[in-house]
C-alpha cells in the first residue's frame, strides 16, 4: 500500500507557489512570468497564516532544514513527523535529539516497506541514537508512506516536498507551506494519529531496529560513508 498527503491552497498563496515553480524553471530559461501568473482570486475567509516557501540548491541557503530545526527548537509539547526518508546531517539529528531530551514528544513515522532498500538501510542507522535520546520511531506496516508532514504543538505545521534527507535538504529544488493557526492542522494531527494505529513501534534494541536483517545492517554501515550522496 501507498500513503501520501496533499494540501489544497487557495488565494494569494497559489500565486506564490506558481512563482516558486517559475523561479526553478528560470534556471534553464527565462520565461515571461506574467503570462503564467493568473489574476488573484479572492479566497474564502480562513483563520491563521500560510507562508509558501522554496529551497534552491544553488544559493547556499538551507531553508528547508532551517524551518524544521526552528520548529523543533521552539516546540513545547510535541513534534509529530511523517517522512519517507531519514538520512540526517549532524544539525538536524541534534535538533531532533535535543527536543526529545528537553521533554518534547518527538515522534517519527517512517515506511515499514521501503521503495529504496539503500535509503531504508541508512534511515535505520539513525534509529539507535535517536531512540537513546527519547525520540519515538514507528514504521507504517501496510506499506510505503510518501507523506512529508510536520506538526508542532497543534499550532504550527509544514506540508510539502521536503524529505528529511540530504537530497531534499541540500541537492534538490523543493517547496513547502508553513502554517500557523489554520483549521487543517487539526486534520493533519488526526491523520498522524490514525496512521500511528497501523504502525510498528521501534524499540531501542538491535533486533527491533534491524529485525534480523544482517545484510541490510551491513549495507547501512557501509553506505554511511557516502550518505550525503544518497
Give the predicted meaning of each segment.
Residues 1-230:
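Charged, low-complexity intrinsically disordered terminal segments
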Amino acid at each position: 500500500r501507498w500513503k501520501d498527503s496533499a494540501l489544497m491552497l487557495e488565494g494569494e498563496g497559489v500565486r506564490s507557489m506558481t512563482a516558486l515553480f517559475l523561479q526553478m524553471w528560470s534556471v534553464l530559461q527565462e520565461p515571461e512570468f506574467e503570462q503564467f501568473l493568473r489574476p488573484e482570486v479572492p479566497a474564502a475567509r480562513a483563520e491563521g497564516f500560510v507562508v509558501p516557501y522554496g529551497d534552491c540548491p544553488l544559493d547556499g541557503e538551507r531553508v528547508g532544514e532551517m524551518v524544521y530545526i526552528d520548529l523543533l527548537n521552539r516546540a513545547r509539547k510535541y513534534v509529530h513527523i511523517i517522512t519517507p526518508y531519514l538520512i540526517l546531517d549532524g544539525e538536524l539529528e541534534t535538533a531532533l535529539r535535543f527536543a526529545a531530551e528537553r521533554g518534547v514528544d518527538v515522534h517519527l513515522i517512517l515506511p515499514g516497506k521501503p521503495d529504496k532498500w539503500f535509503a531504508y538501510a541508512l534511515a535505520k542507522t539513525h534509529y539507535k541514537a535517536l531512540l537513546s535520546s527519547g525520540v519515538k520511531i514507528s514504521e507504517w506496516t501496510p506499506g510505503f508512506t510518501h507523506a512529508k508532514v510536520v506538526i508542532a504543538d497543534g499550532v504550527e505545521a509544514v506540508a510539502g516536498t521536503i524529505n528529511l534527507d540530504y537530497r531534499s535538504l541540500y541537492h534538490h529544488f523543493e517547496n513547502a507551506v508553513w502554517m500557523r493557526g489554520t483549521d487543517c492542522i487539526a486534520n493533519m494531527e488526526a491523520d498522524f494519529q490514525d496512521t500511528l494505529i497501523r504502525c510498528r513501534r521501534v524499540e531501542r534494541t538491535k533486533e527491533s531496529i534491524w529485525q534480523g536483517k544482517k545484510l541490510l545492517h551491513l549495507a547501512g554501515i557501509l553506505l554511511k560513508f557516502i550518505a550525503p550522496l544518497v
